[in-house]
């Protein structure tokens, strides 16, 4: 066993042992024995022992209803502990991320070694770094917040136990604390009883900021500064903070009727309240630290006679008073009280920055740089990264809601029906109104509740302090009028600045038309004047993959980006591409470094803006050290992509991708849309319907309550297939298309694409990862337990397809087995399979019992239902991504 993994294995086995003792104390020896038997059978089954595999199935089928929950919980909790150990391993000196902050050093050394790059060019690239991470409340974070806190503490214990020099009594204390934490987790219900509200989701986002990002961001900037000094002799300017955080929690109303204008207003206030709370703690530290007397004449002039004795403290105490007054006012507003704004209310970042920066400059000038560069510097950087709003909010709404609102308005005004007008007529009307000085909305108009909601949301944007709302994203954008309509509604609300409005192109057709839409918009003089040389466009990954399959979608995304980059470059517009990717492969997820380097050349010139979703937020930003690691990876990748962009693909490669795209899309849609057996098979072979019972996010799982696959959101669609281990959306169509191109004699060309074109090699790498997580015998077992025999041939057909796909991918990549070049991930999947397999078998059994009871008109047994929910959460932990 590789040395690197032995530390991980020993931690996993130690945590497993403690969990075993906890189970024994709580439920007795016999349950622990039952769990141990199942674990050993699973291990042996994985090693290829068919007799033990059969015994595993029989044992799990024969569990009594009383045994179901303890067994499901044992394996589910074990997987959470294994994930925690793995997370620690990724930041421990013995593990992976001994190397991650090194990413920056490695990248800088690589760039310095390129003869065509001067140090000045590299510095300029660093200065133009821009990374905006958009936290979204996707319902994929299955783990309850209370358990996440316990796992963070388990992580801290593992860190201290790694210290060889601790005394025996300290080691014993730490082991006792670990036992307490694992016992607390065991006796906590891991399934939420109620769906979180949008405000709960926003609070979850603030908790990530407080527990991890608040410390992680300044630490990352220190690391970046150190590497730049060492490699380029260059110091980061104090005001330079290339990373920002935005949130969709409380702002994303697309398909979520629970997010209203009032909710957004509340979340904006709550976010500002949390910012004052966190900055107050920082300022309190600075009040006690900055006791120095010597100051520059400028600082002494600023504080006057009153503050001359302790000028720095004087300024900090003043700032503290303003923060306290601001917090009290926000608290009253949150309780619904209407109060006049107090004097000194903090609404802009400059008001926080100026007194802090004045102290910084004075300390530097008086030879106290070592003090200036301590906590004060960290706070200054937090002002730049988080500031008064803490996290900015994006507003997202579906395009048809704006069209319907304008339709209702034009009908009321008696000037026709906007909804039925041609695109040219819509544009003419919108541009006329955008240029007009008179208001369009009549004062006494009483619109419908839906339209009122759209108008109220625009009102909230107009009232919010400038800078607290980052962008207005239009989902399902199809035409230039979709973008102009939002600008008109914002103008009518009285917004006094050019709010960034980003169309989101998310189906195959919309991606293919994206460049035409943006070209038309950029040809409108009024629009060019408004945007002042900057444009944001969002690329949807999940809906396009659900619409056309992963191969066709990824090529459409690439081509749309490529065309938009060239169009904007020609027009002299700085384009920011906003990537709406999920954590799972079927929703565009890929390891960050590979994903960024596989984008078209020039795609990161306007910075990187990307969604971080659900459980990925915890995996990538759950601890300050992991935050440093993740931000370092992004930084290295952006620098490399901008300074050493991937080559333009050859024309012949583009033609092959066009071909792969058509073949794979036809096959994918042939099954998903046209095969009459597909939807009944999907509904019975996966826990799709049961997933709806999980109180995950505040957003309904379907856009429309009735309807087939097309009405399902992308997340439950992926989630369901991940549960039964067929992982279908992440590969269906791709391998068949590759096979067809190989049969046409183009294998050597595909191999060259794999070697020399990051876009293509990343695609294949992602397919390999999906195949490594998929499991055909388990998928077959779900069929046998749950699916009508008439549909078995379809299941067999799909499994055969996957087997063929694996062969062709390995042949093109020249690999003997899956994940050959990422042994760390392969090891991690193997480690978890032993614990995930029993949960899969058990889930199929539970679905069988639950559906059987329903068929017989009985109420489902609550023990079965609860155990089922636990298996869903456990498998999600085992797969390390849900949707």
Curated annotation (Swiss-Prot):
The keyword Lyase applies. GO terms for biological process: carbon fixation; oxaloacetate metabolic process; tricarboxylic acid cycle. One of its GO terms (molecular function) is phosphoenolpyruvate carboxylase activity. The active site is at residues 138, 546. GO terms for cellular component: cytosol. Gene3D superfamilies: Phosphoenolpyruvate/pyruvate domain (1.20.1440.90). Pfam families: PEPcase (PF00311). Its cofactor is Mg(2+). The keyword Magnesium applies. It is an enzyme of class 4 (lyase). PROSITE patterns: PEPCASE_1, PEPCASE_2. Its EC number is 4.1.1.31. Keywords: Carbon dioxide fixation, Lyase, Magnesium. Forms oxaloacetate, a four-carbon dicarboxylic acid source for the tricarboxylic acid cycle. NCBIfam families: PRK00009.1 (NF000584). HAMAP family: PEPcase_type1 (MF_00595). Belongs to the PEPCase type 1 family. This is Phosphoenolpyruvate carboxylase. It comes from Shigella flexneri.
């Amino acid at each position: 066993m590789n040395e690197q993994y032995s530390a991980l294995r020993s931690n996993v086995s130690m945590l497993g042992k403690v969990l075993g003792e906890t189970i024994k104390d709580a439920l007795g020896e016999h349950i622990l024995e039952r769990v141990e038997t199942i674990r050993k059978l699973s291990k042996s089954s994985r090693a290829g022992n068919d007799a033990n595999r059969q015994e595993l199935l029989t044992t799990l089928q024969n569990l009594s209803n009383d045994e179901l929950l303890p067994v499901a919980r044992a394996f589910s909790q074990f997987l959470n502990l294994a994930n925690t150990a793995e997370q620690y391993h990724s930041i421990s000196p013995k593990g992976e991320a001994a190397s991650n902050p090194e990413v920056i050093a490695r990248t800088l050394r690589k760039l310095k070694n390129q003869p065509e790059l001067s140090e000045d060019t590299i510095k300029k690239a660093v200065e133009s770094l821009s990374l905006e991470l958009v936290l979204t409340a996707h319902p994929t974070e299955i783990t309850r917040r209370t358990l996440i806190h316990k796992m963070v503490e388990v992580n801290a214990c593992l860190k201290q136990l790694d210290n060889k020099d601790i005394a025996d009594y300290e080691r014993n204390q730490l082991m006792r604390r670990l036992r307490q934490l694992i016992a607390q987790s065991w006796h906590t219900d891991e399934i939420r009883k109620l769906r979180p509200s949008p405000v709960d989701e926003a609070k979850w986002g603030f908790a990530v900021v407080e527990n991890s990002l608040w410390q992680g961001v300044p630490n990352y900037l220190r690391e970046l500064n150190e590497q730049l000094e060492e490699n380029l002799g260059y110091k980061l300017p104090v005001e330079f903070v290339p990373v920002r955080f935005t949130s969709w929690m409380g702002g994303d109303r697309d398909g979520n009727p629970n997010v209203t204008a009032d909710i957004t207003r509340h979340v904006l206030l709550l976010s500002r309240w949390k910012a004052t709370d966190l900055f107050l703690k920082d300022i309190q530290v600075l009040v006690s630290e900055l006791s120095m007397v010597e100051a520059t004449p400028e600082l002494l002039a600023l504080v006057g006679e009153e503050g001359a004795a302790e000028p720095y403290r004087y300024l900090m105490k003043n700032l503290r008073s303003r923060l306290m007054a601001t917090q009290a006012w926000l608290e009253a507003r949150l309780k619904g009280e209407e109060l006049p704004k107090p004097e000194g209310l903090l609404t802009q970042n400059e008001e926080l920055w100026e007194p802090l920066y004045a102290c910084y400059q004075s300390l530097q000038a008086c030879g106290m740089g070592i003090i200036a560069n301590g906590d004060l510097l960290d706070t200054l950087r937090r002002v730049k990264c988080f500031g008064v709003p803490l996290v900015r909010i994006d507003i997202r709404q579906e395009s048809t809601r704006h069209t319907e609102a304008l339709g209702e308005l034009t009908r009321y005004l008696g000037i026709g029906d906007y909804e039925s007008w041609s695109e040219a007529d819509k544009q003419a009307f919108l541009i006329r109104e955008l240029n007009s000085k008179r208001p369009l909305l009549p004062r006494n108009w009483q619109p419908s509740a839906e339209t009122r909601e759209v108008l109220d949301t625009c009102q909230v944007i107009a009232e919010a302090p400038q800078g607290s709302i980052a962008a207005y994203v239009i989902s399902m954008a199809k035409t230039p009028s979709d973008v102009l309509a939002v600008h008109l509604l914002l103008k009518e609300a009285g917004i006094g600045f050019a709010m960034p409005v980003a169309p989101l192109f998310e189906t195959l057709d919309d991606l293919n038309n994206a460049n035409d839409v943006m070209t038309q918009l950029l040809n409108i003089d009024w629009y060019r004047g408004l945007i002042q040389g900057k444009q944001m466009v969002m690329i949807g990954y999940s809906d396009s993959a659900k619409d056309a399959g992963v191969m066709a979608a990824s090529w459409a995304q690439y081509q749309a980006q490529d065309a938009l980059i060239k169009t904007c470059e020609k027009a002299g517009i700085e384009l920011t591409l906003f990537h709406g990717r999920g954590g799972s492969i079927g929703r565009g997820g890929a390891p960050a470094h590979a994903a960024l380097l596989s984008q078209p050349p020039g795609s990161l010139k306007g910075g990187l803006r990307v969604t971080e979703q659900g459980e990925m937020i915890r995996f990538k930003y759950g601890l300050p050290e992991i935050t440093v690691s993740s931000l370092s990876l992004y930084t290295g990748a952006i620098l490399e992509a901008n300074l050493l962009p991937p080559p333009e693909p050859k024309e012949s490669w583009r033609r092959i991708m066009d071909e792969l795209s058509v073949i794979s899309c036809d096959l994918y849609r042939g099954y998903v849309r046209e095969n009459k057996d597909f939807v009944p098979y999907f509904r019975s072979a996966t826990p799709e319907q049961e997933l709806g019972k999980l109180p995950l996010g505040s957003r309904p799982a379907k856009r429309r309550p009735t309807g087939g696959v097309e009405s399902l959101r992308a997340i439950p669609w992926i989630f369901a297939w991940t549960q039964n281990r067929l992982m279908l959306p992440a590969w269906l169509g791709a391998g068949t298309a590759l096979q067809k191109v190989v049969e046409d004699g183009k294998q050597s060309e595909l191999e060259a694409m794999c070697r020399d074109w990051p876009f293509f090699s990343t695609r294949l790498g992602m397919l390999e990862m999906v195949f490594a997580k998929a499991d055909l015998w388990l998928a077959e077992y779900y069929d046998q337990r749950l699916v009508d025999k008439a549909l078995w041939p379809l299941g067999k057909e799909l499994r055969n397809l996957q087997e063929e796909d694996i062969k062709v991918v390995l042949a093109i990549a020249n690999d003997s087995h899956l994940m050959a070049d990422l042994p760390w991930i392969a090891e991690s999947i193997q480690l978890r399979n032993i614990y995930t397999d029993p949960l899969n078998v058990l889930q199929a059994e539970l679905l069988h019992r639950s559906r059987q009871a329903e068929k017989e008109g009985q109420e489902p047994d609550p023990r079965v239902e609860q155990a089922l929910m636990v298996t869903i959460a456990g498998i999600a932990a085992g797969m390390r991504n849900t949707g």
